[in-house]
């Protein structure tokens, strides 16, 4: 998502987007002046992207095949950090690339939402996959028994962000990650 968002900012607003692992407030600068985009404007731009540009997001290599394998042994829930107003567009965007699983919108740390999912579904084992280190920390705090895989499928972004200290493993390719996930889900 990040590279698609950055491409959109560049083409539509002449804003350079350089992801920063710990401070989203430092990620956007006006190309002509080098000045930071104000934080309130940043959130408006992000909302604007999700309102009109979600279709720019493309399928991550090997994701569809990996999810197909995982779906054979587990329920898949996509926990997306978007407001509820974007639920229908997120479902449509995922459906357009062949991903058809339950989608839940969330704002903030994902630990409470993961905890509720575990309470509601009572799985024997659960695996959480996310690109944001803070979400791994949140899940570790709320549900330490959940396996946590840090994955950043965008290679440009992956080079910028260190492995999440609260994740059990960092794998940035679904073709490799699926075996790690399946091992956790099917262990006795």
Give the label of every model feature segment.
Residues 1-42:
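Active-site neighborhood of HAD-like aspartate-dependent phosphohydrolases
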Residues 27-56, 107-129, 180:
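N-terminal/domain-start segments enriched in small and hydrophobic, helix-friendly residues
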Residues 37-39, 48-78, 84-91:
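Short, acidic loop-to-helix structural element flanking the phosphoryl-transfer center
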Residues 75-76, 125, 147:
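Residues at the starts of beta-strands that form the adenosine-phosphate
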Residues 83-127, 135-141:
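Substrate-recognition "cap/lid" segment bordering the active-site pocket of phosphatases
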Residues 102-108, 168-176:
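Short acidic-hydrophobic, aromatic-tinged amphipathic segments that line or gate anion-handling sites
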Residues 112-115, 157-166, 180-182:
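Short, charged, surface-exposed secondary-structure boundary motifs
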Residues 128-172:
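Acidic, Mg2+-coordinating phosphoryl-transfer loop and its flanking beta/alpha structural elements
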């Amino acid at each position: 998502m990040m590279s698609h968002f950055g491409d959109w900012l560049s083409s539509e607003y002449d804003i350079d987007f350089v992801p920063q692992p710990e401070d989203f407030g430092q990620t956007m600068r006006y190309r002509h002046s080098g000045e930071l985009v104000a934080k309130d404007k940043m959130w408006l731009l992000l909302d604007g992207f999700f309102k009109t540009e979600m279709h720019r997001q493309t399928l991550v290599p090997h994701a569809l095949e990996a999810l197909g394998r995982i779906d054979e042994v587990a329920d898949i829930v996509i926990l997306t950090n978007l407001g509820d107003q974007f639920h229908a567009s997120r479902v449509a965007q995922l459906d357009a690339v062949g991903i058809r699983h339950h989608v839940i919108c969330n704002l903030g740390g994902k630990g409470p939402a993961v905890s509720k999912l575990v309470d509601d579904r009572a799985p024997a084992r659960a695996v959480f996959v996310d690109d944001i280190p803070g979400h791994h920390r949140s899940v570790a705090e709320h549900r330490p028994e959940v396996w946590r895989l840090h994955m950043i499928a965008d290679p440009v972004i992956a080079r910028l962000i260190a492995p999440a200290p609260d994740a059990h493993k960092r794998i940035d390719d679904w073709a490799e990650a699926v075996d790690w996930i399946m091992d956790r889900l099917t262990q006795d």
